[in-house]
Amino acid sequence: MIGIIAGDGSLPKLIVKRFNNKKFNHVVINLSKKKNKKQKYVFAITQISSIIQILKKNKCKEVILAGKVTRPNFTDFRFDKKIIKFLPKILDALKKGDSYLLDLVIDILKKEKMKVVSCTKYLPELFANNIKNKKLISSQDLKDIKKGKNLLENLNQKFDVGQSAIINNGFVVAIEAAEGTDQMLLKSSKILKKLNKNNQSGILIKLPKKIQDLRIDLPTIGFKTVKKCIDLRLNGIVLKKNAHIFLDQEKSIALIKKNNFFIKIIN
């Protein structure tokens, strides 16, 4: 039996749908803000004892964490004894960044003899690996890719930031911070419209951070991101192999084929 701890977003819904289609034995614990009456187990992240109890009751040996989970509300009356025990560590992790908080969740589950695994262990088709492009990648694109890769790798060695960047003809247009990729694209739209007024150029590059645990925090792109990049007249999106989930693949690939655009996978 596999436990799925589901937060907000489209990824948990997709995982549950695929698990149902493949008839994998699983139990879903809903941590989403949007509660579903059909779901049996609905909790807050602060109810860790109850969550573990359900996972043990269903004999879950492996657990998948997916979706965005709201940071703990320390005025929430639904605290339980186990979460209070870990409260000093939680506060310390929150100061360091979300990645450290996720590490703590893994540690708690490990102590309960449950292994956290990536959803791609059972759903490898979610990886953005096998994309066929019509558009040829230019020498300038390759230079932008190299610059973006070096930039992000150097930046996220020291800081819990820098999952993506926009590079246009050697110029760093934007670096993602806490706002997320789509908001970064939105904030960069004005300058990109000026840069790409007469031609199409530039790339969005996304790489996982060095401290990112890809079992529980795989970077994700989908149709919305692809469409926004095309609307901003970028040449393409660059992703790392076996490190990104690609949602809405069929819909996105159909859009890519209709436009002069590429998705490149790098090592």
Where are these regions (language model features)?
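Short coil/turn connectors at secondary-structure junctions
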Residues: 1, 22-25, 37, 59-61, ...
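N-terminal basic/disordered segments at the start of proteins
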Residues: 1-31
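General beta-strand structural signal in soluble alpha/beta enzymes
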Residues: 4-6, 27-30, 63-66, 116-121, ...
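Conserved mixed alpha/beta catalytic, RNA-binding, or beta-rich assembly cores of soluble enzyme
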Residues: 11-12, 95-99, 105, 112-230
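Short glycine-/acidic-enriched loop or helix-start segments at secondary-structure transitions
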Residues: 13-15, 74-76, 249
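A short acidic, amphipathic alpha-helical/loop segment
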Residues: 14-18, 64, 228, 251-252
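Feature captures the catalytic cores and cofactor-binding loops of soluble hydro-lyases/lyases
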Residues: 31-36, 43-53, 60, 78-86, ...
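N-terminal glycine-rich phosphate/adenylate-binding segment common to multiple enzyme folds
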Residues: 51-122
